[in-house]
Amino acid sequence: AEAEFTGHMLEVTLGPGMLSKNYDGLQNDLDKMDGVFLKRGQYTYPLDKERVWHFVPLANVGDKVQASAWLGQVNENFQPLKIMAPFTMKGTATVKTIMPEGDYKIEDTIAILTDEEGNDIPVTMIQRWPVKRAMTNYKEKPRPFKLLETGVRVIDTLNPIVEGGTGFIPGPFGTGKTVLQHAISKQAEADIVIIAACGERANEVVEIFTEFPELVDPHTGRKLMERTIIIANTSNMPVAAREASVYTAMTLAEYYRSMGLKVLLMADSTSRWAQALREMSNRMEELPGPDAFPMDISAIISNFYGRAGYVKLSNDETGSITFIGTVSPAGGNLKEPVTENTKKVARCFYALEQDRADKKRYPAVNPIDSYSKYIEYPEFEEYIKGHINDEWIGKVNELKTRLQRGKEIAEQINILGDDGVPVEYHVIFWKSELIDFVILQQDAFDEIDAVTPMERQEDILNMIIDICHTEFDFDNFNEVMDYFKKMINVCKQMNYSKFKSEQYEGFQQQLKELIAERSIKQ
């Protein structure tokens, strides 16, 4: 059979009915397909044409509208979704007719617009958009500044990510990338979660398909799946579909951002997406770049990350796409092209480390190598001063300095032995261990410790900083070790107790008594 050209780029179909769906990289609905493998040339329509939606008009006859203006609203899984003017429309149009409130199918015409040349444009609930073209249907794209709470202390306290920010998580096999992603997608303050499982092993994708529907959304108490879309492309699916899957996910995210929603997009893993780019480029006999990746790999990655962000829409509402990608470098080598180029464009870097995972210090994020460039943004500083307190960033920087100092002293103790360094050094080392055990380490399987709200994180931070500023009196290093182990135990018990409960305050009292035992009164 001959190939026919449609004259269209690879496009996705956008409309109500996409939430809680499982798609492949070309937006085929996987739940409608049978069998273990996808059959050749098998396509399914991504939306349900028969389902009826309750439409409420938002625009009036005679209104002047531009592309992606909100014309009406439908509710999907309690999430209000906007029906918008066609994204491809040029200039300004006038609303000629709009349907009254009622029940309609996605292919029914719900409005007719008249463009500047007098042509009528019928509008249904469906939009089509090419995946590789970024949607620029917003008024401006300011620098993001709002803290995105994830409930993970090592992220929120030490290296915060913002609403509309970009981050990436590199890490070798078995360091807990997926658990960390699950925690973020479950706990982060987002309206819509999109997961692109791109080039994952089939068993990992099955795990996502079986585990995600079971997760309960802590914000609403309902199933997390109700506001999630999963795009799955296992390693044995076609290379071209694997390349497209990440773009498909980003296009769906941009569609929801145009409605003024906060979207969290997770890609797991962008390395396999880059490998698909490499295979395509090699087959097309393009010039190979470093490690045989395409020459323009850095431009492709930065263009893609550039599509995320915080935007102001034409009606002054705001929407955002927060993008977190994992990178699985071969052999844990962080110097390969994908990691290097991602590092240039992503503003947050959460380095997962085999050594911390082996010591069971989860989440295994290395606090010294990881960073967040948002801490340096004056807009972010203003936001923190207004929403948390003025001294927050100073205290966070002090924590990082203490962790760095603790690491240096640990190396000295390793070389010189416990007796070879002064007792004060042991105190500095154990203060850094206290920060590690109480702030950085978190139990994802404990109901209370898994999610730490910002108010509680502030409380923990102030408590630990006060202990770090206290001077203690010890005679030898054994006393230091025993004393701080007791202290870590009490603080850990506090982390497992309900905030401000009787149990919590009991441990707080124990901690005060413990500090009073050894502290030198100023």
State where each predicted segment sits.
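C-terminal amphipathic alpha-helical interaction region
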Residues: 475-522
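P-loop NTPase catalytic core
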Residues: 157-158, 164-488, 500
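N-terminal accessory targeting/assembly segments
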Residues: 1-39
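P-loop NTPase nucleotide-binding/switch module
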Residues: 33-76, 81-88, 93-95, 105-165, ...
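Short, surface-exposed secondary-structure boundary micro-motifs
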Residues: 2, 8, 27, 70, ...
